[in-house]
Amino acid sequence: MIKGLDSLSNEQKELLFRVNELHTKCVGSDYKDGMEIIETWVNENNTVCARLKNGNWYHYTQENTWF
């Protein structure tokens, strides 16, 4: 279960999973397990954020990018 997922709109959920899939495809095999989303929220700028199993968190943008 992903903490905070219920607070996202359907559009935000689609963005979350789409960008995470792209993000996961870009990392090496050793890192793929840590790319699982464990928590999500929307920040004050209305940007979807995701905390991953590896402890890192990212902003996921409408342009299908992350930072």
Predicted regions and their residues:
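A short, surface-exposed beta-strand/turn
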Residues: 56-67
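N-terminal non-globular leader segments, chiefly Sec-dependent signal peptides
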Residues: 1-47
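Short linear proline/tyrosine/threonine-rich motifs used for host-factor recruitment
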Residues: 50-52
